[in-house]
Amino acid sequence: MLLLPYRSYGTANRLYFIGRVLDNAPLPSPAERGSTLRGLRTMWQRLETDEVPNATVEIGLEGHVTRVTTDAEGYFRINLTPSAPLPWNDGWHPVPLRLVGLPAGVELTGDDAIAATATVLVPPPDAEFGIISDIDDTVVETGATSLPRMFRNTFLREYRQRLPFAGVAEFYRALQVGLNGKRNNPVFYVSSSPWNLYDLLDDYMTHHGLPAGPLLLRDFGIRRANLREGHLDHKLREITQVFETYPTLTFVLIGDSGQRDPVIYREVVRRFPGRVRAIYIRDVEAGLAESKRDAIVTTLAAEIRAEGVPMLLVPDTAAAAAHAVIIGLVTPPAVAEVAIDAAKA
């Protein structure tokens, strides 16, 4: 039995928790290497989950215990208000969880209860801005525009062997540091990948030095609502929730031209006027003649600029960083570090 809390976010007065309960054996660590066959087998085990509905999870927050019940896919989601505003600390708050009940009224007590720790990001009041980034073909090449390449990258290659785009980790760390040097600008990752890949993505981010942040993934369950919700709907919903959680914070949005990121970000700009500092779109066809996809992005960029927000279609991370320093998001020394790493590509 597994109790899997996912990294989430909140404010000093409200915390959002999300996690899942599965009746599966623990999977090998993403750090363990093996044959392609073993990798395929492990990926199948990761995707073929046995969910535990109607399980009871206890959340211990500031001396108070709250119980939440898992849904048909084994997920639990809840917003909690602490008894007093939380201090900032380093931005992350560990919260103890326990799995204390199973379906059919089975209770787990004492040593039988399964424990885990949730971590919740609470940005400080002096954060300069937030960063919201896509993952696939923005941080790491997935090949979402080509099904065979996407299958090969996702299922046949070990995640740790897939290098992030040159300069990405340095650029994201520079944005997190900002101009005040406090490294307290929150980073959020939004992806249409399923929650089943959470441990792989979390390990990947840590291994390659990307700033820690909530990973907002997608439920690929069989419920009708899940089947109806597409790539655009999921991302827009998650980004909207982040914006509404931090109504005084502005954001930098980062994505790619391979899917619907420019369309989603245009809608975000319209819903939240004055809240977007800049948008950087990685050109997945950089170096090629201008394509229909590039033309669409160029048109959208013009529409967004008319709203007062710069949106750039960039060939690489160095180009995004060069613009970011001009508009006061990062420091010149940080841009130099990004350029050095990007030149290694």
Regions found by a protein language model. Give the residues of each.
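Intrinsically disordered, serine/threonine/proline
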Residues: 1-123, 305, 317-345
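Alpha-helical substrate-recognition element adjacent to the catalytic core
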Residues: 8-11, 51-53, 69-72, 112-230, ...
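A short linear-motif detector with a strong N-terminal bias
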Residues: 35-38, 56-57, 109-112, 168, ...
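A generic secondary-structure signal
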Residues: 46, 82-84, 171-178, 204, ...
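Short helix-terminating capping/connector loops at secondary-structure junctions
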Residues: 88-90, 125-126, 180-185, 246-248, ...
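Hydrophobic beta-strand segments of well-ordered beta-sheets in folded domains
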Residues: 95-97, 130, 187, 251, ...
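C-terminal cap/substrate-recognition subdomain and adjoining C-terminal extension
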Residues: 193-345
